[in-house]
Curated annotation (Swiss-Prot):
Residues 263-708 are annotated as: Central conserved domain (CCD). Residues 798-809, 900-920, 936-947 have a biased composition (Low complexity). Residues 921-932 have a biased composition (Acidic residues). The lineage of its organism: Eukaryota, Metazoa, Chordata, Craniata, Vertebrata. Residues 39-63, 703-715, 877-897 have a biased composition (Basic and acidic residues). GO terms for cellular component: endoplasmic reticulum exit site; endoplasmic reticulum membrane; Golgi membrane. Liver. The modification Phosphothreonine is found at residue 850. The keyword Cell membrane does not apply. Plays a role in the organization of the endoplasmic reticulum exit sites (ERES), also known as transitional endoplasmic reticulum (tER). Required for secretory cargo traffic from the endoplasmic reticulum to the Golgi apparatus. Involved in peroxisome biogenesis. Regulates the transport of peroxisomal biogenesis factors PEX3 and PEX16 from the ER to peroxisomes. CDD domains: ACE1-Sec16-like (cd09233). Pfam families: Sec16 (PF12932), TPR_Sec16 (PF12931). SEC16A and SEC16B are each present in multiple copies in a heteromeric complex. Interacts with TFG. Interacts with SEC13. This is Protein transport protein Sec16B.
Amino acid sequence: MEPWVPQTQGRTTGPSRDTNRGLQSGHYRPRLHSQYSGDKYHQWQDAHKNSKSQQDLRDDHQQSHSVSRSGEWSQPVSGADYLKGSYPSHLYSRSGYGDPYQRYHTPTPRDEYAYGNYYYHGHPQLLPEERVARQGSPYIWHEDHGDQRYFGEHHREKHNGTFGANSDTQFQFTSKNPYRDSPASVSGQEQPGEFFPESEAQKQKPLLTSKSSLLQQHESGLSSSSYELSQYMTAAPEEYEPMVSAAWRPIQADDTSATVPKAPMRFYVPHVSVSFGPGGQLVCVPPNSPADGQTALVEVHSMEVLLNDFEDQEEMRAFPGPLIREDIHKVDIMTFCQQKATQCLKSETPGSRDSALLWQLLVLLCRQNGSMVGSDIAELLMQDCKKLEKYKRQPPVANLINLTDEDWPVLSSGTRDLLTGEIPPNVDTPAQIVEKFTKLLYYGRKKEALEWAMKNHLWGHALFLASKMDPRTYNWVMSGFTSTLALNDPLQTLFQLMSGRIPQAATVCGDKQWGDWRPHLAVILSNQAGDTELYQRAIVSMGDTLAGKGLVEASHFCYLMAHVPFGHYTVKTDHLALVGSSHSQEFMKFATIEAIQRTEIFEYCQMLGRPKSFIPSFQVYKLLYASRLADYGLASQALHYCEAIGAAVLSQEGSSHPVLLAELIKLAEKLKLSDPLVLERRRGDRDLEPDWLVQLRRKHKDLEQNRTGAPRDPDSTPSDIYGAGGTTDTPYPDLSGHQNYSEDSEYSSTLWSTAEQTSLTNPLAQQSFPLQRDTYSGHMGTPVPLYSVPATHLAVTSGASGSSVAVTGTPGGRVGEDMLRTHPAFGENTMTQEPLEDPDGLEVISSLQTPAAPRVPSFSEDSAASAKEDEEGSSDGADKPSHPDASQKGKLGDGKNTKSSGFGWFSWFRSKPASSVSTSGDEDSSDSSDSEESPRASSPHHASPGLSPTPPLTSPSLPGASTFSRGTGGSILQGSSNSSGIAEGMGIGGFSGTQGVSSEFYSQPGALPPPPTLQGAVPLYNPSQVPQLPTASSLNRPNRLAQRRYPTQPC
């Protein structure tokens, strides 16, 4: 019997015009054009130019698909075979899809075509489990693609259907789709929102402009990928028109450069936009398009209603916070705490008993207005300890008398037992024991009486007798008494505490073997007397022990009894940060709602007794609690918390918390309209803030101004301070003008603010002379070279004696290391040169305050004096000043020298800090002592071991000031008849070049050749380059230490 061949319904199958075409997969394939190219697109012949040839090809295609083999079942073809058999007269934007004549849906059941993770849905009547996502399944009925009936239906739909009449409108609408116009379409990415009719029922719908393409896609049940696939399988006869074909023409190479680059859209699929409002609202915007005729909706939901069933919100609603002393009654707080304690006792968890004890403590504190009485706390501790435990006596330990493990021996008298030969013990009555104790005292046997009383437990008689004896005996009797008690007996704890030591219970409590910790704390709290610090340390030790055992609530109970201050979460050494919560765990487990509420109640109890006694470190947790209230939709309560925190911050005048203040203002700014009063006072666009918020803003502004207006760091460079310099008056305007100084005195006072603090105390007014700016501007931070090139940069002329001071310095130093301060005295001409401390730690030694301008010892002389001190010990009589004021100031100068004894990088060069060497205040610079002038006169061209190895120089006189220079060696080189001067080899300078250097530097016979110019480097010390001090220059006392360190070079 022949197999049944499926026939077309109501139509005859015409013969094929071309018999050479072969069948593939149940229907014939059109023949490919000979010019096939696979480079970018499949090139086909343009069949749209000649309408007649295109009609012939359509007829040929119609007849070719009407032929089917008998006995073969028609199967759908794959994408690759479909490409090979595609009709050559049409361009396709995607490869792998068949001829446009075959892109019609059949009313019969079809298969689902898998495309990625999406499916092209076939007949809508099939269930999802019946639609198998496989092509060619033998259990699914398919319709032949080559059926002639569908081509006839195509003509009828073209003339009678509404889709053909409105094709222009449809393509005009879809071309404005933002998803199709996005750059993702260029890259080949699937675009949602493209619509073509899928079935006959959808073809009869009204115009597409009445509904959006996304809504049409949603109703058809197609996803973005399967919907794009359906475009190539849906009947679209309008695509044969030139306008429509151009809309779907692939982008050519010349069109790519002409396209304008567009930013890719963030979301390709419409979604709901959600935002949280500051007042506890949830704002939702559905993806409706008003351009498509849909209503734009904005949904506002209340977070309080949405989260009504959450446990955290219920817990926060039940709490009567914020706890402000004037706004809430303490009965409500006590009721809340009692309810919490009852809940903890019902839970029967390991820490529930201790947690309930904390809540009961808060009830007691609230009842007593925050006062803690030891007896009341002890009563609270002993509520659950109605049955006192029977503490067992410890086993006998080493006896205090014979150091054995035997118990106290009992004297006995009686007849010997005939069987055992032992004398049975005679049980004495209490009267007999006391009588014997008395008889021993009759004969003066105190020690035997004590032993008898201790053996027979007459501890009262023994302790009284021992108290009248020596302390050692009393301690022995006390130790014997306490050893008879159990270790975990609260009496043992009390007696140990009264003995002046930390009880053992404070270090071992919390164990099951030890027993309950509450009786021990109760006996400590109710018997506080004597050393309060000892009791507090014992309670804190007990809390630390309990915390180590994991009993956090119990340890915090002890900390509260010991009045331990609250700490911070980040400081793990603090004892507690929140009541009942350990800050050693992570923050979310630490800052729980219950812990914050407990701590706030404790703060409220303190404020009942002492108003405005806020906990400073707790305010940040209250702000966190207010933020949680706002998150759960309780905006009004959160705003009240902000007001309470603001009152606490404003009450703390001494402390400032800028970060907390800024975050508090931000949260209050968002929640301020939750207050009905603020909302009523609102006028137009102007918001009237509450008074406490205005005060917070003012305080925050003051803090910011204080931070920005703080004094600059002394290490700052002068270039940073030049811009802020000002001009101030100086008591020496003629000197400033005479020396051509810069008048930027604010720079000088700002740069040396630390030097003013370390200067010598002077009751007179202090005024610093400004420096000349261009003298040192190019040498900031340059290392100090070993060779010293004197440069005169400061001259101070004394009006009375005509003397002047010339200060020399080495190049390459920092700016302020040779800075001099003068303290003028009104009515007399007195100059004081104070040591100024450089930011790097170096200090400049200068002379003391004297009526006349005395000589200031240089670093070279200080080194020589240091070497003398090493040799002579403590005898420095020749160098001590004779004037009392100079002596006092010399001591101060010694302290400063000791502070900077290292002298920076050449600290190894000195044996010990040099003491300031100064002359008497009554001496003139021309009338120096013989002890100072004689060695200098004997060696005019030799320098002592010091920082500067250069010979004495002659500093050029500044205009109007006649000076003479005394070099580091000490000899006078040049002078004038009407003036005298002192040149100080400061050893540290901030000036460069050979500015102010005399020409005699290169002409004197004993001078060294000029050193090479060193830029940015510190040369090593070479003793051979430093001329040594001869033995005759040390006041007839050879400086052996200096000779041993630096031997004299042979001539």
